Amino acid sequence: MAFFSIFKQGQIYLNTWPLEAKLGIIFPENRIMKATSFAQKFMPFVAVFAILWQQFYAKNDLMAFSIAILTALFALLIPFQGLYWLGKRANTPLENQSAVWFYDICERLKQLHEPLPFVQEKPTYQHLAEVLKKAQSKLERAFWQEI
């Protein structure tokens, strides 16, 4: 998989995974996704603030400017760390227990005649996210209590 396609897959996974409280107990995705979304929104402002702060208070200090640039770069790279993790996670095959759970949810959705994602070999976390998204919209709330 190409380096930049991992980031794109991470963004797709971020947008697909349902942020249900019950899922947060089982999977780390909820915490990672909230942190990544927060970083995508606010880290560009932190980067700009770091440079502007340096320009206001230490205008002619090259060492302070280089530290401000490094701080800005670090702030801008934080969302990419989350997207990279999510992209890798999306393409990871499910563990055995999660795969059993995946097929159980698929059976429930098949009973409602819902189209399901095509799975060639072993389902991945992206497939699980797609099925959970459908389950969130098509199955009753009691489903989330059973988890």
Swiss-Prot record:
<keyword id="KW-1003">Cell membrane</keyword>
<dbReference type="InterPro" id="IPR007334">
    <property type="entry name" value="UPF0208"/>
</dbReference>
<feature type="transmembrane region" description="Helical">
    <location>
        <begin position="67"/>
        <end position="87"/>
    </location>
</feature>
<keyword id="KW-0812">Transmembrane</keyword>
<keyword id="KW-0472">Membrane</keyword>
<comment type="similarity">
    <text>Belongs to the UPF0208 family.</text>
</comment>
<dbReference type="Pfam" id="PF04217">
    <property type="entry name" value="DUF412"/>
</dbReference>
<keyword id="KW-1133">Transmembrane helix</keyword>
<keyword id="KW-0997">Cell inner membrane</keyword>
<dbReference type="GO" id="GO:0005886">
    <property type="term" value="C:plasma membrane"/>
</dbReference>
<protein>
    <recommendedName>
        <fullName>UPF0208 membrane protein HI_1205</fullName>
    </recommendedName>
</protein>
<feature type="transmembrane region" description="Helical">
    <location>
        <begin position="38"/>
        <end position="58"/>
    </location>
</feature>
